[in-house]
Amino acid sequence: MQADTPKGCFVAVVGPSGAGKDTIMDAARVALSGDMRFHFVRRIITRTQMPGTEDHDSLDEADFARAAGEGRFALHWQAHGLRYGLPKTLDDEIAGGAVVIANVSRRVLSDIRRLYTSRSVVVISARTEVLAQRLASRGRESREEIAARLAREVGFDDGSGDVVTIDNSGEVGASTKAFLHHLHEIAVKTIA
């Protein structure tokens, strides 16, 4: 192994709104608590904490721009009128041998593939009718907005060979089990 080869792995979790990414990641975080091989990244978002949303750190636009300019993010992007960032410290976790798991936008997959040689892209998906039902139950968007959102959804597998898809249309426990199985496989392969 070369000295500059990371010991750990970056696991990028992507998928459409309503697929259950946060639910599965939260369950996996609980199941893996205390296992130092795994590190779940807490995102930084230009949105204050609200009930029913992911647990994250908040920055206003000016502070976020300053942090980005100072290189404090490993990755950052803009989506749905908000800015998102992952702290630069995740690189230290990977260098130290951890499997680092983060919910990201498909917009940064090319950056992830360029920056992280040891990586896996996990697509959490669900059937369109399931996504529509879940989005409607949140009560944040009109029926028309949900239809427009679903019409914009695109595939995540671009043939790069690093994609694992988990269909979360059914029981979330089965999807979480599949996600945990994948994470354990990565840990066995990447951590000596």
From Swiss-Prot:
Disulfide pairings: none
Enzyme class: transferase
Catalytic activity: alpha-D-ribose 1,5-bisphosphate + ATP = 5-phospho-alpha-D-ribose 1-diphosphate + ADP
Matches recorded under SUPFAM superfamilies: P-loop containing nucleoside triphosphate hydrolases
Cellular component per GO, a single term: cytosol
Role noted for this protein: Catalyzes the phosphorylation of ribose 1,5-bisphosphate to 5-phospho-D-ribosyl alpha-1-diphosphate (PRPP).
Name this protein carries in UniProt: Ribose 1,5-bisphosphate phosphokinase PhnN
Organism: Brucella melitensis biotype 2 (strain ATCC 23457)
Gene (name only): phnN
